[in-house]
Every structure is written in structure tokens, then in C-alpha cells.
Amino acid sequence: MLWLLRHAEAADGGPDDERPLTERGIRQAEAAGRALQTVGANMDVCFSSPKLRALQTAQLACAPLGVEVIVDRRLAGEPFDLKELTAGQGDVLLVGHDPSFSLLLHDLTGAQARMKKGGLAGISKGELLVLLRPTELSAIAGQRVA
């Protein structure tokens, strides 16, 4: 299973690579991790963009899952070779940015969907199985992010 998690809400201003999550973004990332835990998602590894907002999202979401976060520059926003990145891995969580993730979602599944900040997609064998907004993730996690 391939999971795509778009970074949660980040602060405006400052250098793009260094924008941290807002308080709301922190809650969104924590909710994503709890929701994944609640549904029994089993990731072998998490790859994250090096941009601060994505890395913080990955660390917060992966904490309850006990999954290692590996920083990979290919997820910083440009198109990347998914097969090369995930070769030899089982179930993978990628944490990154749009428009790359929405384009990847379309390329893999044909879905015409745009991922929201803090949104999660689950893909298996070219089929989009899950597409959740942050509010839906927080409901699954049993917490409020607003």
C-alpha cells in the first residue's frame, strides 16, 4: 500500500524551506498519525520532503506508528521516480507537497482529485482506496483540529 500525506497547514512568510507548521497544522499531523493507527495502517517506512513543514508533519504522523522517517530531497516538490524511491520497500508513507502529490495521485489512479493540506490518500495496485481531508482524519482519530 502506498500512502500519500500532504504536509499540514504551515505558517506564511519566511523562506519556503523553513516554514513551520501552525498550531492547527500540528494538530492536523497528529490526527493523521492517530487516524492511521486507528485503522491499523502498517507502514514499513516513511519518506519525507526535507522542507520543514513536511518533515514536521512526517515526524508527528509517524510517532504513534513507530515508523522511521527518512528525508529524501526528491519529495521537495519536483516530479520524482516513485519506483526508484520505493524500491524494495513494503507499505510506504510519503509526506510532501502539491501539486506533485495531486499529479502523482492522478498518474497512479486516474483520479482527478486535489489533495488538501494535511490530507491523506491510500493507493493499492493503481486503485485509490482512501482519500481523506484533515477534518475526516481528525474524526477518525477522535480529536478536533479546528
Would you name each region that the model predicts?
Residues 14, 104, 131:
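Residues that scaffold the ATP/ADP-binding catalytic core of kinase and kinase-like folds
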Residues 109-142:
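Domain-level recognition of soluble alpha/beta enzyme cores
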Residues 1-79, 87, 112-115, 119, ...:
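Active-site-proximal alpha-helix that buttresses catalytic centers in soluble enzyme cores
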Residues 87-119:
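Non-DNA-binding regulatory cores of transcription-related proteins
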Residues 88-101, 130-146:
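A polyampholytic, Gly/Pro-enriched intrinsically disordered region
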Residues 34-37, 106, 124-125:
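A short, amphipathic alpha-helical segment
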